[in-house]
Amino acid sequence: MAKWNVLIATMLVCNGAVAQDSLKNLPELGMPLTDRKLVVAHCMTNIIRFKGHKFEDSCNPDYFSPQGNITAAIGGLTQVLPMEDTLLRGASLDSTVAFELRAARASGIDAFQFYYPLHTDAWDEIIEAYFRVSDALHIPFSFTFCISHPSGGTQDYRVGEFARRINRIMDDVGRNNPRWLRTPDGRLIVYLWSGAGLADIPAGAPSPAFCVARAFKQLADQVHERFACIYDINEQITPAKLNDFLDYFPACWIWTLPYHEGYIGNMVAATCAERHRTFTGSAFCDFYTSKLLAKGTWNIYSAEGAAEAGLEKSDRKYIVTGLSYNFRKLLEFGISRDVPLINIITWNDYPEGHHLAPEINHNEGFSILLNYYKSVWKKEPSPYGNRDVAVTFFKQYAHTTVPKPYNFALVPVERGIDPASEDSVEVVTLLRKPAIVTIHGHSVSAPAGLGVTRVFQAEGPVSVSVSRDHVDVLRFRTPAAITLHPLRTNRLTYSYSSEHEAFFTPLVGNQPLWPLP
């Protein structure tokens, strides 16, 4: 009997090795992901405002004010105020989707990868609306799924649930719909975000990456597709772990790891090049959780839960981004590697503060930068080549200032950029010719093309002007102001630019946008 047990165990190991070898280093893993450069943004599928569908509590403007709502005891739950809520709370789903698509295109985005967790069937109609509206309005845009933190049940259950929903969407919008984000050889590009949970990974498995690849192959088979999966990196990954996943995956993308001298992207990009895998660029503009979390966890409070927990049992997560520094450097890093895809983190995750979508703090500033860098990356003329542009970025108080009375614990989730770098006013200029930039009365010379100028913070609104030969070519003053006495914790970056009206008028006309932050 013992001999039979040994024989059976040997057969199982051999069969596993054969299966593993059948997925390892497949020729298609070294094939191109795309034949054109694209900006792909992570889209939080359910964070959208239309009639009968509110924003989740962590970005719901009902809890923006520090008074007059159930979260007044903590000075207001949220610090974000999306433009959509001001304009589209009574609109149809299709009308809101049309606004989202136009705003994304104006921001330089070509495609969405939809945040896609289990047990969110109601979201599928939103995804289908994007296909429907982009087609009806002839808006060039591509779409795909981002399989996100699956958990619960067995691998067969998780795969089956995703397959059921994906099949329904693909059948409804058309499997051959040209808006699906595909490789030149026809594979469906699928993103992972904490996606390894799709697989059952036995304790001590010699290759967790094989288990994950096998699970995604099972999902691809059940939706009658071939996948090109982009593996997610949200840690200081080791070369050994990275190589294990590159044995089975054609590409990877990095989540919110900030740029600094030891940026993990250097190792990841070099390893991908050695392995003939695709390194895709990533950039995020900010990171501060308007959502309130149970202290020491990532558990999100509802508005009622936040009010009940109060300041002592809550915290907010934060990554120092150096105003626009991190966003610019990550874009420059991707351009220097001539990546085929640049991933924007994110389009509309207002609760984590890394959104490009129009909102009271970020406005259009980061979108202006993305449009400029996109033209450099694609070796095309700058969209601002015929005029002078200035964009300012600042925090609304210095990092050493203590808000009163609503001071939340701030927990840094990544390090690398000096917090003091955010105690300034930064102005990024895109100039036709050299000029003088004046900020708060401090004047400095700025070069043609892209330039960055910083001055110390000063209380009040930020005034910016650009002049040549003592004549102003542009001038603006920010609606928001720097304060010495903040009421509540808020480390969101504020941005505003000389392009404010030119950016928003095609989107909203002359409608009032929002109050002051």
For every predicted segment, state its role.
Residues 1-22:
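Bacterial Sec-dependent N-terminal signal peptides
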Residues 20-423, 434-450, 457-472, 476-517:
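Glycan-processing catalytic domains of CAZymes
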Residues 429-433:
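Non-cytosolic beta-sheet module surface loops
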